[in-house]
A protein has these predicted regions:
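Boundary/linker segments of alpha-helical solenoid repeat arrays
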Residues: 37-43
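Acidic/polar loop patches that form or flank catalytic/metal-binding clefts of enzymes
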Residues: 23, 40, 89-92
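Long, intrinsically disordered, low-complexity segments
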Residues: 1, 32, 45-150
Length: 150
């Protein structure tokens, strides 16, 4: 299942990778505009504590807008990974994002120091043995299974 926010982020990443940071910022800001507190919106008490004010009903959108210059002057892929992480939290696409951007090994080792058994080949998952058993004619295991799992 795909949401509109994810579609905007895919378009933003595609635009940014092509060097069109202005269009990328437009798409990212569409997502951020939806997520921002809007003028006059009632905020939960926990937000007041973090924000430091009571009955503060101003919009937060201007404070979270991203500009073309910000995208141009940052590691764009890492920026998009962070943005996707916030927007798509819990939607089970983080592994695919990290593998697709070739950041899987680096990020897991950085943010999960207890993952001592992690190897580069873990970016690929093992092909189920039941699938391999059904192949006809049967091939050599090194040709049928992803590297590291044989």
């Amino acid at each position: 299942r795909m949401r509109l926010g994810e579609t905007y982020l895919i378009a933003a990443e595609a635009a940014g990778r092509k060097g069109d940071y202005d269009l990328a910022a437009t798409y990212v800001n569409k997502v951020r505009e939806r997520a921002a507190w809007h003028e006059g919106e009632v905020k939960v008490p926990q937000f007041y504590t973090i924000e430091g004010g009571v009955n503060d009903t101003h919009s937060t959108y201007d404070a979270i807008k991203v500009t073309e210059a910000q995208l141009r002057n940052t590691d764009f892929v890492e920026f998009m990974l962070d943005e996707r992480g916030r927007e798509l939290l819990g939607e089970t696409c983080r592994w695919e994002d990290l593998v697709r951007t070739e950041k899987f090994y680096e990020w897991v080792k950085t943010f999960n120091p207890d993952a001592t058994g992690l190897k580069e080949f873990h970016k690929l998952r093992p092909i189920p043995q039941t699938h391999i058993d059904r192949l006809s004619p049967a091939g050599v295991i090194t040709e049928e299974q992803n590297e590291g799992y044989y």
